[in-house]
Amino acid sequence: MTHIEREVKIKLFSPPLSVLLTKLKNKYTFLGEESQKDIYYNSPVRDFRQTDEALRIRKSNGKIELTYKGPKISSQSKSRLEINVEISNLEDMDKILQNLGFKKVIELEKTRWNFKVNNYTISLDSVKGLGDFLEIEGIDVDEKNLLNFVNNFLSENEIKGESTLKSYLELLVEKIEKTNSDPN
């Protein structure tokens, strides 16, 4: 399926994840909890870090998807083309990609709690090695409407944090590179 995904990602400062999770469960439609494992790849013909693309296999509660994400198309939100294909076998897809020259970049694990509010999906993410985040996502939604919704949602729920346009992949790679280059 092809669509434009628009999202805003916020590194949570307050309230703590457990408090926010309880608050949102009492206030909004809870869609469930997911354990996700993502494997990211880089292309043999171009560097996805340079082209701002991503290719991953995601395993989430027994479902496996291959996802291509195109370059970001906005400086206000993380908006990009996204194509998802359900696959039946993670190991075989991994072998296909590696035999085609794709290289594994990193594996990322997170626990995600999803909520539905109007036309938006609200996700609380606890990302191994990175901490806690809030994502507000709309599919094929107007960017201005998304940004207004985000501001109102944060204010209404007294959420403090820092917005980032970087993906979890970018944040984790940066953290690893910083750790590896830090002489201390």
Where are these regions (language model features)?
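Short glycine/proline-enriched loop/turn "hinge" motifs that connect secondary-structure elements
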Residues: 123-129
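C-terminal accessory/tail domains of diverse enzymes
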Residues: 60, 124, 144-145
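Long, well-ordered alpha-helical scaffolding segments within enzyme catalytic domains
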Residues: 144-161
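Residues forming anionic-ligand binding surfaces in small-molecule and nucleic-acid pockets
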Residues: 69, 129-133
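N-terminal strand-loop-strand beta-hairpin
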Residues: 1-119, 156-184
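Residues forming well-ordered secondary-structure scaffolds
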Residues: 92, 110, 131, 145-149
